[in-house]
């Protein structure tokens, strides 16, 4: 409830509540809690559902996700989570190469859950096959996935090549350089890139503050990025979406229409809510954000 109420300060009108890899008990309680809030009522930005990130990830590309809880995907276990969530899981990140015969991928697609490839060691060919079975997006492109190489194209290469696959990308300038952001947006075009913050609950806390994320200690760096104190590895960000928009336009030199689409109509289309979200049209929700020239938020409606 606190997150929903305050995220409007950065111009966000709707979002997915996101989990991380944890034990079955913790994840079950987490999705049940989100469902309770959604159904009991809350103030602020609309919770469109749950983004279930983990535990169906690859060990090598797990990032800051706690490895002791990573498991192979099964339809049976996911059904239990979705039952606890009362059907509110709308988006799942998983390493689809771990999904035997794409069973969970196909089940999710058939039941209205968007499948996004992420924290994955999939090859280019495996990504193409997952796309053919209904995978629709990639989670934080460049990060937590096989890189591009001219002899091993990887997931990054698949993100570029599969034109009609959506791709999230963290636009803080730390997870990916400005040049990498520009390359991705200019290659992908205006319709399939999705800006994300990858922000943690530590958003808004002071520089140098320490927190527990998935059982691991993290610290907030001066640039707003979060790092594991044990290894120094990136563990997310504290980025505000309006600042991400400014970074894309002013630092990464991405055309404004590409940048604004990435945080409005593109994610709405990916989630299948573009009939009421993502653009100002007759009959849609009147979600309006007023920005100053410096991208600071004047008002969110």
PLM feature spans:
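Divalent metal-dependent hydrolysis catalytic cores, especially in the metallo-beta-lactamase
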Residues: 2-30, 45-58, 85-97, 113-116, ...
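Generic structural signal for well-ordered alpha-helices
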Residues: 3-4, 28-35, 78, 105, ...
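Conserved, mostly hydrophobic/aromatic
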Residues: 7, 52, 108, 138, ...
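Short, electropositive alpha-helical surface patch
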Residues: 27-41, 105-114, 255-256, 260
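Divalent metal-binding pocket/active-site signature
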Residues: 52, 59-154
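Residue-level marker for buried hydrophobic side chains located in beta-strands
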Residues: 116, 193-196, 289
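Active-site-adjacent C-terminal substructures of enzyme catalytic domains
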Residues: 126-258, 263, 269-274, 294-295
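C-terminal cap of metal-dependent C-N hydrolases
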Residues: 269, 274, 279-301
């Amino acid at each position: 409830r606190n997150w929903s109420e305050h995220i409007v300060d950065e111009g966000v009108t709707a979002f997915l509540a996101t989990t991380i890899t944890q034990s079955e008990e913790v994840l079950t309680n987490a999705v049940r809690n989100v469902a309770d809030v959604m159904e009991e009522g809350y103030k602020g930005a609309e919770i469109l559902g749950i983004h279930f990130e983990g535990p169906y990830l690859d060990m090598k590309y797990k990032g800051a996700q706690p490895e002791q809880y990573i498991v192979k995907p099964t339809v049976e276990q996911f059904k239990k989570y979705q039952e606890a969530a009362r059907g509110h899981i709308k988006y799942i990140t998983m390493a689809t190469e771990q999904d035997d015969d794409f069973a969970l991928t196909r089940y999710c697609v058939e039941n209205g859950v968007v499948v996004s490839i992420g924290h994955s060691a999939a090859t280019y060919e495996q990504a193409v096959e997952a796309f053919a079975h209904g995978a629709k997006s990639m989670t934080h492109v460049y990060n937590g996935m096989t890189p591009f190489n001219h002899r091993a194209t990887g997931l990054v290469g698949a993100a570029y090549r599969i034109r009609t696959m959506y791709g999230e990308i963290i636009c803080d300038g730390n997870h990916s350089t400005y040049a990498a952001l520009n390359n991705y947006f200019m290659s992908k075009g205006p319709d399939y890139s999705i800006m994300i913050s990858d922000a943690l609950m530590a958003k808004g806390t002071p520089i140098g503050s320490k927190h527990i994320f998935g059982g691991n200690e993290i610290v907030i760096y001066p640039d707003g990025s979060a790092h594991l104190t044990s290894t120094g590895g990136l563990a997310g960000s504290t980025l505000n979406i309006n600042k991400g928009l400014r970074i894309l336009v002013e630092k990464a030199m991405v055309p404004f229409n590409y940048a604004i689409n990435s945080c409005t109509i593109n994610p709405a289309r990916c989630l299948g809510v573009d009939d009421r979200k993502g653009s100002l049209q007759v009959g849609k929700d009147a979600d309006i954000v007023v920005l100053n020239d410096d991208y600071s938020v004047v008002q969110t409606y």
